[in-house]
Amino acid sequence: MEQVVIVDAIRTPMGRSKGGAFRNVRAEDLSAHLMRSLLARNPALEAAALDDIYWGCVQQTLEQGFNIARNAALLAEVPHSVPAVTVNRLCGSSMQALHDAARMIMTGDAQACLVGGVEHMGHVPMSHGVDFHPGLSRNVAKAAGMMGLTAEMLARMHGISREMQDAFAARSHARAWAATQSGAFKNEIIPTGGHDADGVLKQFNYDEVIRPETTVEALATLRPAFDPVNGTVTAGTSSALSDGAAAMLVMSESRAHELGLKPRARVRSMAVVGCDPSIMGYGPVPASKLALKKAGLSVSDIGVFEMNEAFAAQILPCIKDLGLIEQIDEKINLNGGAIALGHPLGCSGARISTTLLNLMEHKDVQFGLATMCIGLGQGIATVFERV
């Protein structure tokens, strides 16, 4: 079986969804920009040699509809002979895109794939056109379709207080701002055209979603967003609404060596699981355990984790049940996470994997794990090994 390697990984800056940098930039353009950039950064690979493009996107309608992967590839002037498919596993879409490409390479059906994902939550809101089947409530709690309420449920089940959530959210912003200031994101962010507050076209090379002024005291003043009477989850402890894209160049190890391209990491194992939709945010726990089992590793073998921060109330129970509470500041989301950077749904799987690869190199660790919860009760995880 072929070894699957990541040759390169990049992303756009994360733009605010409400009147942000990409308010006049379409999702296809964000995607095409990264496709062009990945190929330009790796000229040893001819675009025509790509076997397929796998691109995650959740709200596949309006500008994100009609197979955005193919639309973006055509905009990027990728040769018409290269196919492209859009992948949807909700929040895990672009990580699923990576898994799909990896399996193709493992079986010998492909040698080089471009993977990634996008979501423009300013142009296509998460709730746009959603129409749940009325009979679904016979099998699943109606509130399971409301992500904020599932986070409230997890917080109550695991004893996660409002204070703990506020502290974690403040940490996310502080870490992300420190990473920005130190240049830790420089290797992953591709400068991307957008408009500033005055409407002037400029190149953005930083995440505009981060709020460096965030404090625990300020967060404590916010009202509960989903359960006004008894809730603890606020807008400040939820992932920010943002627009962005991320992309990775994935190849067989043998093809990378043939072309003289240096792999950054191997895909050591992959896992996806289902869980109770009412606690959809718990998915990373069984997904991570399964991925570690497939890799023949334990939690203690992983040097650094990227866990998508859908909500502080959601990620803290996962950290707790993976036995990592005492190691948060050594191993978990060291450059902040979605609370600070935002969670553009179809982009996030590739985004956290990209950030993880850079952290693994910076911290000089052998193994890293990226994992995320998925709406309606799923979890997805990938174990990476540095080459």
Curated annotation (Swiss-Prot):
One of its GO terms (molecular function) is acetyl-CoA C-acyltransferase activity. The keyword Chaperone does not apply. Keywords: Acyltransferase, Cytoplasm, Fatty acid metabolism, Lipid degradation, Lipid metabolism, Transferase. It is an enzyme of class 2 (transferase). The active site is at C91, H343, C373. NCBIfam families: AcCoA-C-Actrans, fadA, PRK08947.1. SUPFAM superfamilies: Thiolase-like (SSF53901). Belongs to the thiolase-like superfamily. Thiolase family. It comes from Escherichia coli O157:H7. Catalyzes the final step of fatty acid oxidation in which acetyl-CoA is released and the CoA ester of a fatty acid two carbons shorter is formed. Involved in the aerobic and anaerobic degradation of long-chain fatty acids. Heterotetramer of two alpha chains (FadB) and two beta chains (FadA). It catalyses: an acyl-CoA + acetyl-CoA = a 3-oxoacyl-CoA + CoA. It comes from the Bacteria. Pfam families: Thiolase_C, Thiolase_N. One of its GO terms (cellular component) is cytoplasm. Its EC number is 2.3.1.16. Its main location: cytoplasm. GO terms for biological process: fatty acid beta-oxidation; phenylacetate catabolic process. It is found in: Cytoplasm. Pathway: Lipid metabolism; fatty acid beta-oxidation. PROSITE patterns: THIOLASE_1, THIOLASE_2, THIOLASE_3. This is 3-ketoacyl-CoA thiolase.
